């Protein structure tokens, strides 16, 4: 049976669920308390991350490399429990590159369901039963008739610490804002009804690329100048203005609402505070949504509003406390094991896995710790830095020049180096493997249609066109542009004996076929016929253009006539037995087969009728 805030069972007799904190943490060391206090449902890897973050003076998550407000516990827990952080935690543990917030946003916007992307990155958990036993800090627990229930802590009003009967007596009034990519939706609920709502979409991110245009511009690669980039940049600015306009129009409602739920990327949050809506950065009413959401629209907002009101049942109070006691003991033992192992191994990295094989183990055997498996992973050996005299800034500029096909700037960039570094720089251009796909500069030039740089690398730098990237493709296969492929083919023609061309995938150039006299004669006749057709087409085009000019002159002449002159011309043609004038009386264009008429006038459209009546009210 599902319960909500509107369930009649909770109108009275609701008591907060209390934990004996002194008994729970009794005998625990300072390090253990840090681990035990991480009341989250993200497993042991999340608790270790929590301990690491508390020991540093920073405002950035070291796993996701994104800003996090460590002064707000709710925001902190919401980040650590999010799919974004859990995904990056697993990827980092497997020595994989972590997602940026923009890339992960692009994955959520893609056509594939987010569940499939979890499967792709291997986001499966073996700790589901263990996680379910933890007491999440983002939920508020209460007791009713000997059973334990919980609601999202975010729905409590400012100043409320625990759930009471008042929580269920009042309407669930709030404002919800969802913004992801170019999709925005907002709504306000008053007296349990949606009173105002607004949703729209703008093109601000390239399909399946992830990230809005402003994030791409600030990524260090320079602002793109394509028509699509300019359109996305314009749409993003208009989108911000529309959102601020909506919030300004709702200002009086927003100042009265007790809760504000906002779900958006971190770099978009300031937009809500900059609007003239009376919302400040540290507004105590602002809440995060404690679950994943889909594409922003009005239906999704309604679904969020319903899910925020759901009440979860956790069984009898005695059973629930017994489960908590068991979990507390397991966490104490694991904390001691982790702390001792860390002191012993020093620089070792630890990955702790939990096994539930001891669920039925006798209590007298608590000292056994075979259910804790501790693996140690040695730090990888430091790799030798290639080309040490070429700093990161120089390499980044080189990469940008190649992408922009600025070969002259690239040459000047190389010439700025000392003579003793030139050979090292040329070796870097020939052999550098650029992450994440281990692409060479030939791959980068071909993929970005940088034809000038491509010729420079082939003919002057002598780059190897058979070197393959991380996907096993040579530079020739990195582009579908026919002009780029022609550069590779021309290079092969000039250097046919240079090496094994089969490895480069560059095809042989087409050989010219010797024609017989008859074939040459037929080819000449076809060219002659084609030329005649082209000449006839040009002649016809000129005639049409001439007729259009004459028609425009006649039309302009007719439009410039006064009403008296038009009527006189019509009478003269009727008396002379000539056909009537088949032109619109207002704009002068030729009339359609069935013109619009009123009085004795003919018009081409209703707009012309309206304009004529407006100009001639009598």
Swiss-Prot record:
An individual GO BP term: ERAD pathway
Residues in coiled coil: 510-557
Basic and acidic residues: bias regions: 505-515
Gene Ontology MF term list: endonuclease activity; zinc ion binding
ZnF endpoints (C2H2-type): 59-85
Matches recorded under PROSITE patterns: VLRF1, ZINC_FINGER_C2H2_1
Residues passing through the membrane, by range: none
Positions of region (Disordered): 502-539
Organs and tissues of expression: In larval stages and in adults, expressed in intestinal cells, specific neurons in the head and the tail, and in the ventral nerve cord.
EC number per UniProt: 3.1.-.-
One GO location term (cellular component): mitochondrion
The VLRF1 domain, residue ranges: 170-311
Compartments it resides in: Cytoplasm; Mitochondrion
Function: Endonuclease that cleaves polypeptidyl-tRNAs downstream of the ribosome-associated quality control (RQC) pathway to release incompletely synthesized polypeptides for degradation. The RQC pathway disassembles aberrantly stalled translation complexes to recycle or degrade the constituent parts. Dispensable for viability and growth but is required for protection against oxidative stress and for wild-type life span.
Name of the molecule in the record: tRNA endonuclease vms-1
């Amino acid at each position: 049976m599902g319960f909500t805030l509107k369930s009649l069972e909770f109108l009275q007799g609701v008591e907060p669920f209390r934990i004996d904190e002194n008994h729970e943490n009794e005998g625990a060391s300072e390090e253990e308390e840090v681990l035990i206090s991480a009341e989250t449902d993200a497993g042991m890897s999340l608790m270790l991350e929590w301990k690491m973050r508390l020991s540093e003076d920073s405002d950035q998550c070291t796993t996701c490399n994104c800003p996090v407000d460590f002064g707000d516990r709710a925001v902190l827990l919401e980040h650590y429990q999010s799919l974004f952080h859990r995904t990056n935690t697993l990827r980092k543990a497997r020595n994989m590159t972590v997602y940026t917030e923009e890339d992960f946003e692009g994955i959520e916007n893609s056509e594939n369901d987010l569940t499939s992307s979890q499967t792709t990155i291997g986001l499966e958990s073996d700790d589901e039963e263990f996680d379910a036993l933890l007491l999440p800090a983002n939920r508020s627990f209460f007791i009713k008739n000997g059973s334990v229930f919980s609601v999202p802590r975010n729905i409590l009003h400012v100043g409320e610490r625990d759930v009471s009967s008042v929580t269920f007596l009042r309407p669930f009034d709030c404002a919800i804002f969802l913004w992801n990519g170019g999709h925005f939706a907002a709504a306000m609920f008053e007296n349990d009804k949606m009173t105002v709502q607004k949703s729209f979409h703008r093109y601000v991110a390239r399909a399946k690329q992830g990230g809005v245009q402003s994030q791409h511009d600030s990524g260090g690669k320079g602002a793109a100048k394509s028509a699509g980039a300019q359109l996305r940049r314009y749409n993003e600015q208009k989108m911000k203005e529309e959102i601020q306009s909506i919030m300004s129009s709702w200002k009086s409602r927003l100042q009265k609402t007790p809760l504000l739920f906002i779900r958006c990327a971190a770099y978009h949050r300031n937009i809500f505070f900059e609007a003239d809506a009376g919302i400040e950065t540290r507004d105590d009413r602002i809440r995060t949504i404690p679950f994943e959401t889909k594409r922003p629209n009005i239906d999704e907002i309604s679904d969020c509003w319903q899910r925020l009101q759901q009440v979860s049942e956790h069984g009898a109070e005695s059973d629930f406390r017994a489960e908590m006691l068991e979990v507390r003991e397991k966490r104490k033992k694991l904390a001691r094991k982790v702390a001792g192992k860390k002191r012993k191994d020093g620089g070792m990295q630890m990955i702790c896995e939990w096994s539930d094989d001891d669920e039925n183990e006798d209590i007298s055997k608590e000292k056994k710790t075979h259910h804790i498996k501790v693996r140690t992973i040695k730090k990888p050996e430091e790799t030798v830095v290639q080309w040490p005299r070429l700093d990161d800034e120089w390499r980044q500029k080189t990469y940008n020049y190649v992408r922009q096909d600025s070969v002259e700037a690239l040459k000047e960039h190389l010439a700025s180096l000392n003579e003793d570094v030139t050979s090292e720089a040329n070796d870097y251009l020939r052999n550098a493997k650029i992450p994440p796909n281990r692409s060479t500069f030939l791959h980068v030039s071909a993929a970005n249609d940088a034809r000038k740089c491509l010729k420079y690398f082939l003919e002057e730098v002598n780059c190897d066109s058979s070197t393959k990237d991380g996907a096993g493709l040579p530079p020739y296969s990195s582009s579908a542009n026919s002009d780029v492929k022609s550069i590779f083919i021309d290079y092969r023609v000039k250097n046919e004996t240079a090496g094994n061309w089969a490895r480069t995938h560059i095809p042989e150039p087409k050989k010219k076929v010797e024609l017989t006299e008859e074939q040459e004669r037929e080819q000449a006749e076809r060219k002659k016929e084609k030329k005649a057709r082209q000449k006839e087409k040009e002649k016809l085009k000129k005639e049409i253009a001439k007729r259009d000019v004459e028609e425009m002159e006649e039309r302009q002449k007719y439009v410039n006539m006064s009403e008296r002159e038009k009527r006189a011309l019509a009478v003269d043609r009727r008396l002379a037995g000539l056909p009537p004038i088949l032109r619109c009386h207002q704009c002068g264009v030729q009339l359609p087969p069935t013109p619009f008429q009123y009085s004795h006038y003919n018009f081409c459209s209703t707009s012309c009728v309206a304009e004529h009546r407006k100009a001639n009210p009598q």
